[in-house]
């Protein structure tokens, strides 16, 4: 489900001019981005069963140390999938869980790997996805087998169109992961617009949206329609902003916040952390308007079945925004055991920098680096 880069999301005019704060800022105030978002929390009824299966499956690869695997499990990426695909079948829910686990295996390994190694990881994963029934070479990086098994199970009950869209967009996602590694190796901090252009792919939203259409047959021209494109792009950008807002504190503590909109805005507009948070909150409001302008004017194709599928698909995009936000606070990924409290107060303490080169998520101050 490729989203054309010709559909532009305007970057808002700077509204804040406060100078950069001292390096050790006491409190971070999160913007309440979804205060008026109409999609309520919904969860797939197969969550518990799919989580048990997918968590055991992910652990079976021994991709992380036991300590890191424990922290990984506390992130509960299966919850994210079950919130994101509340209407999916048991098979669809399991595929969603497996995909989220695959994403984070790729993320954790690529975050600490040199650029050339990340390129090799990309080639391994794409070869596995394109050849899901071909055994992986002995001694190969574990991500190849994780990807192969995920896709071999998923395609047993997936339409040809959804498979096509997934492969295309996962390739784009991995290209952006390589680009992120290049930026990191060069200590490059992008400007706002070029960062957004890259972040739209590193978030992994496009292949995630392909799982919304596993039981649909959406033609390419439907997904390429300007209104659907605008809707998809607004959704992706809201997911990017939402994720960067909640992950910033941990990323800056890890010394790896260069690929985060908060850092980008602070650097370009000379704002402190909370000035950047407010700026991003205002940007999010613009994206909400873009989303609803498209959502309330969906095209009709004169085919009742296709129109119904489009309606369900687009409703799924709106739900994805809520799902990502809920998971961010309900899991222990970003806020440890204090997620629900922080969801209410929107306030947290700035963590001190605690760099780690260890592979996999690490427990620090009851949160997960």
UniProtKB/Swiss-Prot annotation:
SUPFAM superfamilies named in the record: Terpenoid synthases
Binding site for Mg(2+) 3: 243, 247, 251
Binding site for Mg(2+) 1: 107
Disulphide-bonded residues: none
Keywords: Calcium, Cobalt, Lyase, Magnesium, Manganese, Metal-binding, Nickel
Effect of residue 53 to A: Does not affect cyclization in the presence of Mg(2+) or Ca(2+), but impairs the activity in the presence of Ni(2+) or Co(2+)
Note on cofactor: Mg(2+) and Mn(2+) are more tightly associated with the active site motifs (D(D/E)XX(D/E) and NSE) and thus lead to more efficient removal of PPi. In the presence of Co(2+) and Ni(2+) the activity is retained and delta(6)-protoilludene is the major volatile sesquiterpene produced. In the presence of Ca(2+), the major sesquiterpene produced switches to beta-elemene.
One annotated GO molecular function: terpene synthase activity
EC numbers, comma separated: 4.2.3.-, 4.2.3.135, 4.2.3.198
Regulation affecting activity: Ca(2+) switches the cyclization mechanism of delta(6)-protoilludene synthase from 1,11 to 1,10 cyclization which leads to the production of beta-elemene.
Residues annotated as binding (2E,6E)-farnesyl diphosphate: 333-334
Enzyme class, first EC level, given as a word: lyase
Motif D(D/E)XX(D/E) motif, residue range(s) on this chain: 107-111
Catalytic function, reaction form: (2E,6E)-farnesyl diphosphate = Delta(6)-protoilludene + diphosphate; (2E,6E)-farnesyl diphosphate = alpha-selinene + diphosphate
Site features described as Plays a critical role in the stabilization of intermediate cation, chain residue numbers: 104
InterPro entries the UniProt entry points to: Isoprenoid_synthase_dom_sf, Terpene_cyclase-like_2
Binding site for Mg(2+) 2: 107
GO biological process, one term: isoprenoid biosynthetic process
Outcome after substituting residue 182 to A: Does not drastically affect cyclization in the presence of Mg(2+), but severely affects the activity in the presence of Ca(2+), Ni(2+) or Co(2+)
NSE motif, short sequence motif: residues: 243-251
Cofactor section: Mg(2+); Mn(2+); Ca(2+); Ni(2+)
Family under the similarity heading: Belongs to the terpene synthase family.
Protein function: Terpene cyclase that catalyzes the cyclization of farnesyl diphosphate (FPP) to delta(6)-protoilludene. In presence of Ca(2+), a significant switch from 1,11 to a dual 1,11/1,10 cyclization occurs, producing beta-elemene as the major product, with lower levels of delta(6)-protoilludene and (E)-beta-caryophyllene, and traces of beta-selinene and alpha-selinene.
Record comment regarding domains: The 2 conserved active-site motifs D(D/E)XX(D/E) and NSE are required for coordinating the divalent metal ions that stabilize the PPi moiety of the substrate.
Name under which the protein is recorded: Delta(6)-protoilludene synthase STEHIDRAFT_73029
Provenance organism: Stereum hirsutum (strain FP-91666) (White-rot fungus)
């Amino acid at each position: 489900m490729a989203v054309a880069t010709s559909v532009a999301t305007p970057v808002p005019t700077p509204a804040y001019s406060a100078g950069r704060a001292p390096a050790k800022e006491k409190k971070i105030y999160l913007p309440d981005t979804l205060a008026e978002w109409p999609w309520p929390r919904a969860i797939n009824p197969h969550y518990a069963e799919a989580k048990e299966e997918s968590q055991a499956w992910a652990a079976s690869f021994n991709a992380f140390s036991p300590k890191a695997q424990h922290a990984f499990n506390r992130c509960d990426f299966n919850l994210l999938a079950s919130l994101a695909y509340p209407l999916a079948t048991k098979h669809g829910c399991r595929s969603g869980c497996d995909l989220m686990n695959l994403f984070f295996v790729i993320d954790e390994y690529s975050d600490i790997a040199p650029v050339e190694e990340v390129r090799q990881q990309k080639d391994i994963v794409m070869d596995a996805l394109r050849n899901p029934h071909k055994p992986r070479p002995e001694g190969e990086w574990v991500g190849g087998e994780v990807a192969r098994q995920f896709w071999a199970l998923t395609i047993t009950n997936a339409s040809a169109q959804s498979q096509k869209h997934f492969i295309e967009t996962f390739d784009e996602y991995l290209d952006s992961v390589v680009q992120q590694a290049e930026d990191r190796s060069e200590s490059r901090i992008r400007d706002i617009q070029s960062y957004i252009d890259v972040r739209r792919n590193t978030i992994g939203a496009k292949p995630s949206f392909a799982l919304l259409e596993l039981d649909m047959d959406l033609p390419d021209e439907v997904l390429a329609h300007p209104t659907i494109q605008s809707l998809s792009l607004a959704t992706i950008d809201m997911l990017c902003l939402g994720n960067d807002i909640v992950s910033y504190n941990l990323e800056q503590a890890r010394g790896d916040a260069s690929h985060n909109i908060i850092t980008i805005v602070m650097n370009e507009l000379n704002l402190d952390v909370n000035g950047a948070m407010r700026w991003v909150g205002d940007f999010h409001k613009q994206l909400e308007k873009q989303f609803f302008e498209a959502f309330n004017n969906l095209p009709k194709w004169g085919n009742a079945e296709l129109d119904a599928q489009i309606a369900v698909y687009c409703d799924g995009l709106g739900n994805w925004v809520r799902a990502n936000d809920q998971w961010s606070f309900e899991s222990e990924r970003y806020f440890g055991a204090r997620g629900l409290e922080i969801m209410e107060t929107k306030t947290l303490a700035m963590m001190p920098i605690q760099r780690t080169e260890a592979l996999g998520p690490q427990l620090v101050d009851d949160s997960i680096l």
